[in-house]
């Protein structure tokens, strides 16, 4: 019989499983690892950000981190800062060095600053990288479009992931809305370029409106799907929406929602799909700021960055979001997963573009920790650090029961193994019953036949009077679970 990896059943849908009683969703645990890269040099002064950026495994087994800094003191005036992109390297995903790249010198010494050939203005914000093939890397970032100086998504290509050259003639791929609160007005740009303001504004307004995005965006490439970008999108926040905020913060007239665009070449992007919009289950002042995404076990897993805009609540955190197709997303728990645990991330958590990074039996989540809330920038104390948490693999979201016995039934599944295993933390007890697809008990696999289990186990085997489920291999079944004081994360079948 062909050996194959077990299938994984997660509980990532919007609603609890069928026939649920006395159970609830519960986030999995995280271990805080603290700051891993800090802005302690002139080139990343006070700000080492991984927001939207990524880590890549290289052919020699080492790791390359792309990050960026708002505080880079790389101008002629040593007190003037300019956002720039940088590189760090590691052998273990946790301890990082800042290598001399030989591209940009400060005070006569090499640095880990990246130089992008052909970039008109050396400004790099919100960089997001993809590796298209072994010798084809692409570096997306936000900066000033050539000539117009509009705030735009730009791109550069490289053969080795270190030496990049601008593509598309420095023209923007997507644009930040040209609003007084968000960037330069098109007509003002036209006047500076000595174009006819009315003609220029019409042509460019249509282009910018069609390609509207936000600089909180992450780009991905997959050989089968092509290019995707998940980005924040601003929609007009009308008074009748009930979501207008009457306190100062940036862009009060707009509501931030999440959008996705697709492209065959990563340069020419289609129209956006609005994929996550605040609804009746969300707080009245909910906004979404970004969403890194990764693939796992047939799911698209998103770390949805959200914050509330009412005064005193603008601390950015992440919640979990899940999708099968990238368009329709479930959000089982409407609230943040974890908070900062250090002074460096007390003001908010902005996840890196990888979402979940495989590290054996666990995942790492890298993020930018900030010490102030979204609406406050204290230039004296303002810092950004690349921080990390560790998450046990498969333990993202559980169906949990507390001090009253809970139960639920799984969807029909085809068993691909002789044994059914579960990943669970059981302080009380758990038992299970095997059923047909209509929910009828299967002989010899009743609740009272089950060998009750407890403890913390990632591979606890389900047995009934010592017998497994080999006779039902490649047949459809459902499983009814009863549990007390326990969290069930995953079924392996």
Regions found by a protein language model. Give the residues of each.
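Beta-rich carbohydrate-recognition and catalytic domains
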Residues: 1-286, 295-347, 367-493
């Amino acid at each position: 019989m062909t050996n194959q990896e077990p299938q994984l059943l997660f509980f990532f849908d919007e609603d609890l499983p069928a026939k649920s009683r006395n159970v609830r969703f519960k986030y999995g645990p995280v271990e805080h690892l603290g700051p891993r890269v800090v802005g302690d040099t002139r080139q990343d002064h006070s700000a080492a950000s991984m927001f939207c950026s990524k880590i890549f495994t290289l052919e020699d087994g080492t790791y390359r981190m792309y990050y960026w800094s708002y505080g880079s003191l790389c101008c002629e005036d040593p007190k003037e800062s300019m956002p720039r992109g940088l590189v760090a390297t590691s052998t273990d995903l946790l301890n990082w060095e800042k290598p001399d790249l030989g591209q940009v010198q400060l005070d006569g010494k090499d640095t880990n600053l990246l130089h992008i050939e052909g970039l008109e203005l050396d400004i790099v914000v919100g960089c997001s990288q993809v590796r298209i093939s072994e010798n084809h890397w692409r570096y997306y970032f936000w900066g000033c479009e050539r000539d117009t100086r509009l705030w735009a998504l730009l791109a550069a290509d490289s053969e080795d992931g270190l030496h990049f050259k601008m593509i598309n003639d420095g023209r923007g791929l997507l644009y930040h809305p040209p609003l007084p609160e968000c960037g330069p007005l098109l007509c003002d740009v036209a006047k500076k370029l000595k174009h006819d303001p009315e003609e220029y504004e019409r042509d460019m307004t249509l282009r910018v409106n069609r390609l509207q995005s936000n600089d909180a965006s992450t780009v991905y490439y997959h050989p089968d799907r092509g290019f995707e970008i998940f980005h924040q999108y601003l929609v007009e926040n009308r008074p009748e929406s009930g979501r207008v905020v009457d306190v100062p913060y940036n862009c009060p007239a707009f509501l931030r929602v999440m959008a996705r665009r697709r492209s065959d070449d990563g340069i020419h992007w289609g129209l956006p799909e609005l994929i996550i919009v605040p609804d009746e289950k969300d707080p009245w002042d909910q906004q979404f700021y970004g969403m890194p995404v990764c693939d796992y076990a047939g799911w698209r897993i998103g770390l949805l960055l959200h914050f509330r805009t009412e005064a005193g609540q603008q601390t950015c955190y992440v919640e979990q979001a899940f999708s099968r197709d990238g368009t329709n997303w479930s959000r089982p728990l409407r609230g943040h997963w974890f908070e900062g645990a250090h002074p460096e991330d007390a003001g908010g958590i902005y996840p890196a573009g990888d979402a979940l990074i495989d590290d054996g039996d666990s995942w790492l989540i890298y993020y930018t920790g900030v010490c102030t809330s979204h609406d406050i920038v204290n230039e004296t104390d303002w810092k950004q650090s690349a921080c990390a948490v560790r998450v046990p693999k498969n333990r993202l979201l559980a169906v949990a029961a507390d001090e009253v016995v809970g139960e639920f039934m799984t969807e029909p599944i085809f068993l691909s193994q002789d044994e059914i295993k579960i990943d669970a933390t059981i302080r009380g007890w758990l038992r299970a019953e095997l059923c047909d697809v209509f929910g009828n008990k299967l002989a010899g696999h009743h609740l009272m036949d089950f060998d009750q289990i407890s403890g913390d186990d990632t591979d606890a085997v389900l047995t009934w009077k010592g017998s497994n489920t080999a006779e039902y291999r490649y047949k459809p079944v459902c499983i009814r679970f009863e549990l007390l004081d326990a969290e069930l994360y995953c079924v392996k079948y």
